[in-house]
Amino acid sequence: MTNLNKKPDWIKVKAPNSAEYYNTKDLIKNLSLNTVCEEAACPNIGECWSKKHATMIILGSVCTRACMFCNVKTGRPDLLDPHEPQRLAEAVQKLNLKHVVITSVDRDDLEDGGASHFAECINEIRKSSTNTTIEILTPDFLRKEGAAEIIANSKPDVFNHNVETVPSLYKTIRPGARYYNSLSLLHNIKKLSPEIFTKSGMMVGLGEEINEVVQVMDDLREAQVDFLTIGQYLQPTKNHAEVAKYVTPEEFQYLGRIAKTKGFLMVSSTPLTRSSYHADEDFQKLKENYQQRHTVA
């Protein structure tokens, strides 16, 4: 097992310092937008922002949940900003994004969990950036009747909802969520709009067993999920769950090979894999893999 007191070399990344990085940072600040890149202390922020890639957080910056893996602020959430969809669309247009990823904090305080706000953001982007493909990474909408229908009707190109970890760790790592609710949400979106690609991700290094990871793969395929991401859990602060193990690149490759045998259209399994990392390139590969699988010989 790798020494847990320091990150192994395969986790280390260069500090961001490019002009493109700072241009992206300034644009996001000027439009009063939030990004998961900053809020979650993502290790890939330098690379992504240098390429003008950013994952936008909507519905404010304060979450109603307190998951033990996440660095986003928790507490009493902000009031909904009715102008946020327009500002988001403006950022997408100014960054000239071919593919945008939109995520959010959990909003258990809202009647629909924020589903209609996601839909408004998608609609605004479609108006001004007609060729931009849209990926949304949503919360679980636990006990929010009708939320899945709102999301499915808004027709994102990719619907992503992360199961995050194995079910045995939910009580300690993701206490406000329910594993089977997450599976049900993913399955419902696919049933409501089969043309939407579905995606889910999980972290490893939290103390899970490999047989549990494989069972999650099977559960996600049963829910007709197309794309699986697996990445290393990194402790944001000392107040969060500790890293139980730094999984080696070879072990990630092994997990990736197993996942591919399960029938996913696409698998990304590396230490630095995150839900929206290389999302634009992965979307193109996802479409190509779908077309290849459905081409009649």
UniProtKB/Swiss-Prot annotation:
Pfam family name, one: LIAS_N
EC category name: transferase
InterPro entries cross-referenced by the UniProt entry: Aldolase_TIM (IPR013785), Elp3/MiaA/NifB-like_rSAM (IPR006638), LIAS_N (IPR031691), Lipoyl_synth (IPR003698), rSAM (IPR007197)
Cellular component terms (Gene Ontology): cytoplasm
SMART domains, A to Z: Elp3
Entry keyword set: 4Fe-4S, Cytoplasm, Iron, Iron-sulfur, Metal-binding, S-adenosyl-L-methionine, Transferase
Reactions it catalyzes: [[Fe-S] cluster scaffold protein carrying a second [4Fe-4S](2+) cluster] + N(6)-octanoyl-L-lysyl-[protein] + 2 oxidized [2Fe-2S]-[ferredoxin] + 2 S-adenosyl-L-methionine + 4 H(+) = [[Fe-S] cluster scaffold protein] + N(6)-[(R)-dihydrolipoyl]-L-lysyl-[protein] + 4 Fe(3+) + 2 hydrogen sulfide + 2 5'-deoxyadenosine + 2 L-methionine + 2 reduced [2Fe-2S]-[ferredoxin]
Cofactor note: Binds 2 [4Fe-4S] clusters per subunit. One cluster is coordinated with 3 cysteines and an exchangeable S-adenosyl-L-methionine.
Documented EC number(s): 2.8.1.8
Domain Radical SAM core intervals: 49-265
Compartments, record wording: Cytoplasm
Organism this protein belongs to: Rickettsia akari (strain Hartford)
Major subcellular site: cytoplasm
Record bears the keyword Iron: yes
Names of required cofactors: [4Fe-4S] cluster
Protein name (record): Lipoyl synthase
Residues given in the record as [4Fe-4S] cluster 2 binding sites: C63, C67, C70
